[in-house]
């Protein structure tokens, strides 16, 4: 009888500690010391939330930088999401997969060997908000033409916004770069 009572007490104490006190402590620490990160690293522009620093968006206008292709189409197709239940993730397709090849041809003009790998392939999460500086610089002439500004101004903006990779190439956040473009004075 004593063993059963001890087991029940230990179970209740463990449930209170692990199910209430620990999550409460982690939530409080997050909200006090890491408020921006704990709430999704949201970015505001013109007093409204326009996205997250951590999740890529689908950009199609020629006046903006385009992010990486998304294996989950940035969850813009609710029917597809409903069918396979995937909200993020890579495609896990091999190099010879016909669907992958078709998707890469869709994202890249066929025969253009001057394309960075991140312009043609999706990331592991399918929602990567960054592109390499090299990719951004290759998009600069298109953006400069669409905005009627010099390519050097766009390149300077890219260099100013680049983040150093530790074991990777230097990269830029596409949403932050596009907001900086909109803020740029002609």
Swiss-Prot record:
Any coiled-coil regions, as ranges: none
Keywords: ATP-binding, Cell membrane, Ion transport, Membrane, Nucleotide-binding, Potassium, Potassium transport, Transmembrane, Transmembrane helix, Transport
Domain of life: Bacteria
Annotated membrane topology: Single-pass membrane protein
Stored InterPro entries: KdpC
Membrane keyword on record: yes
Pfam families membership: KdpC (PF02669)
GO molecular-function term, one example from the UniProt record: ATP binding
Main location: membrane
Subcellular location: Cell membrane
GO cellular component, one term: plasma membrane
Keyword rRNA-binding: no
Transmembrane segments: 10-30
Functional description taken from the UniProt entry: Part of the high-affinity ATP-driven potassium transport (or Kdp) system, which catalyzes the hydrolysis of ATP coupled with the electrogenic transport of potassium into the cytoplasm. This subunit acts as a catalytic chaperone that increases the ATP-binding affinity of the ATP-hydrolyzing subunit KdpB by the formation of a transient KdpB/KdpC/ATP ternary complex.
Family the entry assigns: Belongs to the KdpC family.
Subunit structure: The system is composed of three essential subunits: KdpA, KdpB and KdpC.
Protein name listed in UniProt: Potassium-transporting ATPase KdpC subunit
Biological classification of the source: Bacteria, Bacillati, Bacillota, Bacilli, Bacillales
């Amino acid at each position: 009888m004593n063993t059963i009572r001890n087991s029940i007490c230990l179970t209740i104490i463990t449930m209170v500690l692990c199910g209430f006190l620990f999550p409460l402590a982690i939530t409080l620490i997050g909200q006090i010391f890491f408020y921006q990160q704990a709430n999704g690293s949201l970015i505001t522009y013109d007093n409204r939330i326009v996205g997250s620093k951590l999740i890529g968006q689908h950009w199609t206008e020629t006046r903006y930088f385009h992010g990486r292709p998304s294996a989950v189409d940035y969850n813009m197709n609710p029917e597809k999401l409903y069918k396979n239940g995937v909200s993020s993730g890579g495609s896990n397709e091999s190099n010879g997969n016909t669907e992958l090849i078709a998707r890469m041809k869709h994202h890249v003009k066929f025969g253009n060997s001057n394309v960075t790998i991140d312009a043609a392939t999706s990331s592991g999460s399918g929602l990567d908000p960054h592109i390499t500086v090299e990719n951004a610089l290759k998009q600069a002439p298109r953006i400069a033409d669409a905005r009627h500004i010099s390519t050097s101004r766009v390149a300077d903006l890219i260099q100013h916004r680049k983040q150093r990779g530790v074991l990777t190439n230097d990269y830029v956040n596409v949403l932050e770069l596009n907001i900086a473009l909109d803020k740029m004075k002609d």
